[in-house]
């Protein structure tokens, strides 16, 4: 009747793992065959005890493997997790590199600095160091300020606008790029652009329109931008020149109307040029070919606007969370920086998606 002492172990291992159950049966057969008399048997007691004295020497390895924890799954999980971490740019305050296998000739790092205590209405400055082999020598160290989704007079109001202007001027950017969705009413457009005109950059200010701006106030925004010397880019190109060298800016007109705007303005450019594509939604860079772009700047998602433990229940993208925020890549491995933006839409609330400005510093890749 001693065999009943092992019934709890049978039950446990059958539930746990069929492979281990087979090992257990093999071990028990070895135990039984090694018993030469009754004194070698394990007596039935309240708590079963394995009599290790009765194990043959050649069966010890089987038993050791049987009772050793199976860590193969953990090792595979750890390997997958490390691989995933290498392909991500860090969240706030941490800097990591994107390996060359993702984007040959490109290296990108990021960090974030909280500024809300000094600049009410703006939570942080998200910084990117963008190193690329096609960056001209004259643009090594070139600083780009990028803002989007102001939705002026939503959660973002007069005090936030004043903070934004001060913060942008404190960055000493060489150019200001804007990603659209500027307003929550046409009556606010003149006030908004009069304030943004106070941002001083050597190479000026450029912008595209967002879906809000095509629904209303499009003509008013274009008029106010031109009044202050800003350049709207609606399926247009412009050239930034510095010390005899240049980079190209391309802007997309209404990226939601692919029937009319489904051919990217970058397709006419040379792969040898360094090209920044400015578009309101990151979906456009996946919906159509944006070949010859070296960097895409987009907004629209608001970083989810409300994120609970990283989960955003509402994301205005037909790709879900794929292009939610931060450094992303389209299927062609073209890097995209997607900003959380500043204002809000629908509900005047932000949780887990800090209002931000983006600062990008270009660097020329010296050695691959």
What are these regions (language model features)?
Residues 5, 19-25:
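Sec-dependent signal peptide recognition
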Residues 35-143, 154:
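Acidic, histidine-bearing metal-coordination/catalytic regions of metal-dependent phosphoesterases
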Residues 105-107, 113-117, 129-131, 193-258, ...:
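Extended active-site neighborhood of metal-dependent phosphoesterases/phosphodiesterases
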Residues 123, 132-145, 230-231, 238-250, ...:
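Beta-strand-turn-beta hairpins that frame and shape the catalytic cleft
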Residues 138-223, 228-231:
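Membrane-embedded segments
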Residues 147-148, 175-181, 204-211, 233-236, ...:
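Active-site neighborhood of phospho(di)ester-bond hydrolases with catalytic His/Asp-centered motifs
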Residues 197, 282-361, 365-367:
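Conserved beta-sheet core of the metallophosphoesterase superfamily
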């Amino acid at each position: 009747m001693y065999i009943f002492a092992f019934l709890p172990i049978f039950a446990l291992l059958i539930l746990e793992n069929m492979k281990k159950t087979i090992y257990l049966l093999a071990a028990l057969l070895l135990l039984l065959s090694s018993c030469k008399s009754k004194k070698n048997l394990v007596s039935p007691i309240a708590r079963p005890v394995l009599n290790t004295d009765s194990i043959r020497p050649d069966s010890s390895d089987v038993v050791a493997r049987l009772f050793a924890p199976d860590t193969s799954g953990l090792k595979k999980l750890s390997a997958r997790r490390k691989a995933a971490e290498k392909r991500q740019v860090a969240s706030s305050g941490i800097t990591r590199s994107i390996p060359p296998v993702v984007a040959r000739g490109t290296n990108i790092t990021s960090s974030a600095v909280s500024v809300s205590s000094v600049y009410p209405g703006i939570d942080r400055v998200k910084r990117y160091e963008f190193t690329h082999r096609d960056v001209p020598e004259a643009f090594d160290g070139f600083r780009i300020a990028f803002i989007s989704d102001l939705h002026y007079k939503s959660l973002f109001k007069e005090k936030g606008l004043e903070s934004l202007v001060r913060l942008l001027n404190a960055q000493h950017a060489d150019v200001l790029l804007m990603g659209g969705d500027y307003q929550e009413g046409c009556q606010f457009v003149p006030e908004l652009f009069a304030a943004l005109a106070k941002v001083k950059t050597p190479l000026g200010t450029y912008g595209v329109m967002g879906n809000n701006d095509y629904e209303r106030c499009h003509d008013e925004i274009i008029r106010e931008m031109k009044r202050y010397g800003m350049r709207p880019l609606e399926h247009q190109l412009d050239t930034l020149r510095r010390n005899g060298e240049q980079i190209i800016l391309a802007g997309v007109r209404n990226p939601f109307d692919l029937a009319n705007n489904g051919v990217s303005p970058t397709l006419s450019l040379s792969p040898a040029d360094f090209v920044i594509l400015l578009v309101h939604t990151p979906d456009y860079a996946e919906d159509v070919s944006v070949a010859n772009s070296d960097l895409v700047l987009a907004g629209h998602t608001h970083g989810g606007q409300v994120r609970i433990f990283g989960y955003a229940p509402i994301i205005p993208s037909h790709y879900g969370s794929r292009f939610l925020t931060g450094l992303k890549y389209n299927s062609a491995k073209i890097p995209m920086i997607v900003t959380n933006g500043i204002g809000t839409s629908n509900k005047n609330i932000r949780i887990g998606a800090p209002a931000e400005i983006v600062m990008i510093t270009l660097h020329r890749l010296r050695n691959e």
